[in-house]
């Protein structure tokens, strides 16, 4: 689809991998090659992966952006974001815009993110390990129609994810048997908190169709009504699985 969409007037290609909330995987190197051939620059939102698991600049991206609110901060106590590049010309242009527009984080917000970066590696390993355990549980549960996770060999982007990522992350989505069951499920958990954010040490659960992606309803970008999204934290995997088990009934 990307190749067909590129034209002479394409100036910028904005990508996300894994995508939110369906966890599709984009071949970053192939996408960057195609975009550059069309004369466009490539921006990758790397929030779901974090720099620990994926570094888009190494795969041809020109700019990488992150919500520092998520995995980089890691404790759900900061609001921020950043853009990074390894191109001196782009860096100069971004620096000018930042200075002229005042897009500068407060010193305490910056400190919180720097603090979070110190534990990023150990947290991401825990997120990934817990996610793998939760995926195994969901795969075997009859109340779950389908699990969406790039770490599964059955995932269509699994091989690409293996090439460009150092782990499959802490985000999981799955399809319940119906919208009614999905909505009921997210209200029944006790350890998983019903909330829209992600990437913190605590586990979160949400219904994208009624929460984060409600604005896409009745559009080509609408999420499946029976979709549930999980942000797997670093609590005991046994506790997380037991909570999902009772919520799924």
Language-model segments: residues:
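Short, solvent-exposed beta-strand edge segments and adjacent coil->beta transition regions
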Residues: 78-80, 167-171, 225-229
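Mobile, glycine-enriched helix-loop/loop "lid" segments at the mouths of ligand-binding/catalytic clefts
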Residues: 88, 92, 194-209
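Glycine-rich beta-alpha junction loops
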Residues: 48, 70, 119, 134, ...
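Conserved PLP-enzyme active-site core in the AAT-like
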Residues: 3-143, 148
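Conserved small-domain helix->loop->beta segment predominantly found in fold-type I
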Residues: 132-190, 196, 213-222
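PLP-dependent enzyme catalytic core of the Aspartate aminotransferase-like
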Residues: 187, 203-249
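Short, well-ordered beta-strand elements within core beta-sheets of diverse protein domains
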Residues: 113-122, 169-177, 229-233
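A common structural junction motif
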Residues: 101-102, 189-199, 247-249
């Amino acid at each position: 689809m990307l190749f067909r969409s590129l034209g002479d007037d394409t100036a910028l290609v904005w990508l996300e991998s894994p995508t939110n909330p369906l966890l599709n995987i984009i071949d970053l190197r192939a996408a960057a090659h195609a975009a550059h051939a069309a004369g466009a620059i490539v921006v990758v939102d790397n929030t779901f992966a974090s720099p620990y698991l994926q570094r888009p600049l190494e795969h041809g991206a020109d700019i990488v952006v992150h919500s520092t609110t998520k995995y980089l901060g890691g404790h759900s106590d900061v609001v921020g974001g950043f853009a990074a590049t390894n191109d001196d010309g782009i860096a100069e242009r971004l620096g000018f815009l930042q200075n002229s527009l005042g897009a500068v984080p407060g010193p305490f917000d910056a400190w919180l993110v720097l603090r979070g970066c110190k534990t990023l590696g150990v947290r991401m390993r825990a997120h990934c390990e817990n996610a793998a355990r939760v995926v195994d549980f969901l795969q075997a549960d009859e109340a779950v129609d389908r699990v969406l996770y790039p770490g599964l060999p059955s995932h269509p982007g699994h091989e690409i994810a293996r090439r460009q990522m150092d782990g499959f992350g802490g985000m999981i989505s799955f399809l319940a048997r119906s919208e009614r069951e999905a909505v009921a499920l997210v209200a029944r958990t006790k350890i998983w908190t019903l909330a829209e954010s992600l990437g913190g040490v605590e586990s979160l659960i949400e219904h994208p169709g009624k929460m984060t992606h409600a604005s896409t309803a009745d559009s080509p970008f609408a999420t499946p009504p029976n979709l549930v999204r999980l942000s797997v934290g670093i609590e005991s995997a046994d506790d997380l699985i037991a909570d999902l088990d009772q919520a799924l009934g």
